Amino acid sequence: MKASERLLKYAVIYTGSDEDHAEQTPSTPEQMTLAQVLAKDMRDIGLTDVSVDAHAYVYGFLPATADREQCPPIGFIAHIDIVNEFGTSEIHPQIVKEYDGGEIALGTSGRTLDTVQFPDLKQAIGKTVITTDGTTVLGADDKAGVAEILT
């Protein structure tokens, strides 16, 4: 599975933080739901000893490459909670294929992205860009990291 496919799979699972329960981890049941999905995906790609603890921390292990067992281990860490900005739990990713460098309308929300406000968009010309439809956050800072780690 490609990282973009994983991002789309994970993005639609709403994991907004609940400020009323900020003292507990996870602060919402949906965060545990995504943790369970991640654990399954980790098992599916061959990680071993995969587990999810009571706080929605997901652990998995990948054995060292043969003849590299002496190398130091490495760990990858990412979080799965997102901001709760729009007060809705329905996340609608939007895919722009072969981005042409112009303004990207975020669905019918009236919001847009452009290279004046976001100059880094110029690097995406000709590529696929994944955004929200403008009615919610995408949560890509968290979930794209997780998707990349598992790809």
Predicted regions and their residues:
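Acidic side chains
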Residues: 14, 41, 53, 81, ...
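Active-site metal-coordination/substrate-binding segment of hydrolases
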Residues: 68-151
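N-terminal capping segment at the start of a domain
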Residues: 2-28, 131
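A non-catalytic alpha/beta surface segment that caps or lines the substrate-entry region
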Residues: 22-71, 75
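A generic "functional-site adjacency" signal
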Residues: 1-4, 54, 143
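Predominant activation on well-ordered alpha-helical scaffold segments within soluble catalytic domains
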Residues: 4, 8, 36-39, 146-150
